[in-house]
């Protein structure tokens, strides 16, 4: 994945990484990860940082090597690139273009892709993503839902690849997926 980065990006990331690699051993602590990323213009939440650490700190030693960091940054930039895709997906669901996905719009789109849903299933899907409780999904809620789903999928893929021997760290992402948007909607 780091092979998707330009030489210029790698140099920039190395410089930022090196600032926090106090002893020059090629690794930073997981606690420093957020600071390094913010110095590069990223603004990860604590939950995102925990998910990222779960992805790369395979030996749970609290250190992240530069190669692992490059992989994280490449994924973060790729996620940023997919913002246009998310906007387009939201427009597909938001049939009346009012900035919200209603239960009726969700049911309509899901039916068009061959997913017949009961009223209860539609209600569950809406409530999973509906942070403000207004009964609809706005764009911000849609993006959070989709990005969280992507992160969970990457973590699950890594676990399967690693043999599933690790458990999730404590924090928001430690809740069972079924309680944290597993049905989160949509794609």
Swiss-Prot record:
Predominant subcellular localization, coarse grouping: membrane
Phenotype for residue 111 to T: No effect on CAMK1 binding. Decrease in CAMK1 activation. Loss of CAMK1 activation
Kindly list the positions at which Cysteine methyl ester occurs in this protein: 184
Q: In which tissues is it expressed?
A: Expressed in roots, etiolated shoots and flowers.
For this protein, the record's CDD domains field holds: EFh
| Binding-site positions, Ca(2+) 2 | 57, 59, 61, 63, 68
Q: What is the effect of changing residue 27 to C?
A: No effect on CAMK1 activation
- Point to the regions of Low complexity compositional bias: 169-178
- Role: Calcium-binding protein that binds and activates CAMK1, a calcium/calmodulin-dependent kinase.
How is this protein named in the record?
Answer: Calmodulin-like protein 1
Q: Which organism is it from?
A: Oryza sativa subsp. indica (Rice)
